[in-house]
Amino acid sequence: MKFEPLGKRVLVEREEEVKTTASGIIIPDNASKEKPSKGKVVAASKEAEGVSVGDIVVFAKYAGSEISLEDKKYLVLNLEDILGVIK
């Protein structure tokens, strides 16, 4: 299934951040029920200037709308919710 964002929006696959305690216990980000703040752009509308497919973007933790496509979760972000691109 192909998803094409409309308007100034992008489709982002969230990047899970793994945290480790001082004693070496690994705590996945989803254990704290907070969304990661960066992800990979999988699709971008023509109006979404400044970001391209494959870019790693940083966004506010609670930005966007979560959707499921083919049993994977993605985030649809408005362009103005993207804080920057990691190069």
Curated annotation (Swiss-Prot):
InterPro entries: Chaperonin_GroES (IPR020818), Chaperonin_GroES_sf (IPR037124), GroES-like_sf (IPR011032). GO terms for cellular component: cytoplasm. SUPFAM superfamilies: GroES-like. Pfam families: Cpn10. The keyword Cytoplasm applies. GO terms for molecular function: ATP binding; metal ion binding; protein folding chaperone; protein-folding chaperone binding; unfolded protein binding. Heptamer of 7 subunits arranged in a ring. Interacts with the chaperonin GroEL. Together with the chaperonin GroEL, plays an essential role in assisting protein folding. The GroEL-GroES system forms a nano-cage that allows encapsulation of the non-native substrate proteins and provides a physical environment optimized to promote and accelerate protein folding. GroES binds to the apical surface of the GroEL ring, thereby capping the opening of the GroEL channel. Belongs to the GroES chaperonin family. This is Co-chaperonin GroES. It comes from Campylobacter fetus subsp. fetus (strain 82-40). The gene is groES.
